[in-house]
Amino acid sequence: MSEEEPFEFIDQFGEVRRCGSWKVPENFVSSFNTFEGEFPLWTDAQILQALKDPGRRVTRKVLGPEWIPNQGPYSSCNGFAAANAYSRARYFGGKRDGKIFSGSYVYAWVNGGRDAGSALEDSLKEQGIHGNVLLSKCGPSMIYRSQTQKFDTEAAQEKAVNAYAVQTMQGLKTAGAAGFMLIVAIQVGRTWERLDSRGVSGVDSGGGNHAVCCDDYLLLPDGTPVFDCVMDWGTSHGVNGKTYLTEAHFAQTIGRHQFYAIPTGQAGYSP
């Protein structure tokens, strides 16, 4: 993977943030099957039909602020994006016990013993091999294997669901409309923290430095389709720790980072 130094800055609340999602190398081929190769892509009309369904789940009405982690001053966004996707896919797949899993446990498997970021592909592969442990046991500061190996037996009972590599924007929109959890990369800077009156983050210029989980795809009251994103910085940021993203946020990142879709097990897959 294309290892890069994490982007470090002070957020609007004076906390140190490190964004460390690595870009994929040129001609990268994911080890996961592609979403586009496994599922038919929906047309924009079919996607809109799904988003307008009055019975459609609205994640913000189901999952409260306790589902919003704070990765702290570490470059562990890939681990938290993977753990958030697993926690939510598990919940919406029928295991309604409210268990929330640790991104730092996943990150510890892939950071090579230093807090210098990681690649999403590696996080998902290791999550599938080694599993997940509760965030309440393995907190954000536990980012090294010397701290997390004591959880390995327990984590092995919660191995991740299958992931699909998303290659295109139409694939991303189709997966979101079908209820998949999404793992994406965005560029984070000062604009990212500024939400407009609709709750949509500003767009920063760059190829992507922060990985997040989007747990919903929905229409705003003005008809704009948006991806609902877990910011991973606690509930003080955004609206209770979440923000909306549009296609514009991914225009510079979808070719430079590999995106993923995680099935929930109950979404179904038909227009």
Q: Can you say where each PLM-predicted feature lies in the sequence?
A:
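Structured alpha-helical subdomains that flank or immediately precede key functional sites
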Residues: 1-97, 115-125, 129-135
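Predominantly the structural core of cysteine protease catalytic domains
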Residues: 2-12, 83-87, 110-230, 235-271
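Acidic helix-start/capping segments at beta-turn-to-alpha-helix junctions
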Residues: 97-112
